[in-house]
Structures are given as C-alpha cells and as structure tokens.
Amino acid sequence: MKRLCVFAGSSKGSKAAYAEAARALGAGAAQRGVGIVYGGAAQGLMGLCADAALAAGGEVIGVLPQALSDREIAHPRLTELRIVGTLHARKATMAALADAFVALPGGCGTLDELFEAITWRQLSLHAKPIGLFEVEGYFAPLLSFLRSAADEGFVPRATLAAIAVRSEVPALLDSLLHE
C-alpha cells in the first residue's frame, strides 16, 4: 500500500481520544512508509493526522476544493496540495490517489466520503480496502445501523464484511494491507 486516504473530522470532537487516534494514525502510516491522502485542511482531526504524518517524515497530499481554499483553511506544510473545483472532484481525486480508505471520527462530511467509498466498492467501481478506526465506540451506532440495513435487505452482507473495524493503528493498517 503506497497511500491511505483518510476521512476525518474538520473539528477535534469532544474527546481527547479522537485527537490521539488521529495523531497515531498519521504517525503509524508514515512509520510504515504509507503516505496520507486527505481533505487538505489544517484544522480538526484531519489536520492532526496530517501533522503527525509529516512529523514522522511521511508524504501527505491534501485535496481541497477551490471554495474552501478561498477561505484559507489549507494546511501550509503539505508535501503536495491539489486544488480541485468541487467536493465531488475532491472525493474522486482522493480515491484515485489512494490504495485504501480509513475513516476516523467525524461528521457529515466524513460520513459522506466514507459512504461514497463503500458504495463504489459495493458497485465494483474499486476493490480497495476500507477501514474504520474505532475510537471509544464512536462508530458503534453506525455499525448497528448498517447491520440493521443488511438484515432488512438493503446492504449486502459482503459489503459489511469488507469494512475492517479496528481500534489500534497496527491492527488497522495490517488488516488493510492483507485484504
């Protein structure tokens, strides 16, 4: 795996564990020689993940829509910053640059990115591994919903089985590398 696409909150959330997880993921990926592709902002969990990867000597590519770039939220120290026209182009560019996807805790934008990656895999538009970095049960309600949707016949069981859910960086990265 050359690059990992990280979906993460643009805020830090309410628990220190979220920030710790973002830093651990960035540093852990860099220590394994895995670059990070992400939304390009300096703030929130996404910024913390990028900072940690950069501090560990890793490659970090940010992909930022022009509208957000105009608000001056771009991370100033990235290996590379790509400015794209739309949020749709951002997701497509991140997917094209990455070999796997991981979601950290986040809000609607993070879930939008995650669900698009899951949907593309379900439709066989890619076969890239997808992981959730489970931090203090953050994704438990989402996983419960997905199991319910599968029980009701709306989500294939194979889609659920394709999502690696781990609470430690080494186990998460190992699961993505060995899928």
Descriptions of predicted regions:
Residues 104-105, 129-133, 160-163:
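Flexible, glycine/proline-enriched loop segments at strand-loop-helix junctions
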Residues 1-97, 114, 135-179:
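A cross-family phosphate/adenosyl-ligand binding-site feature
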Residues 54, 121-128, 154-155:
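Arginine/glycine-rich "motif VI" loop of SF2 helicases in the C-terminal RecA-like domain
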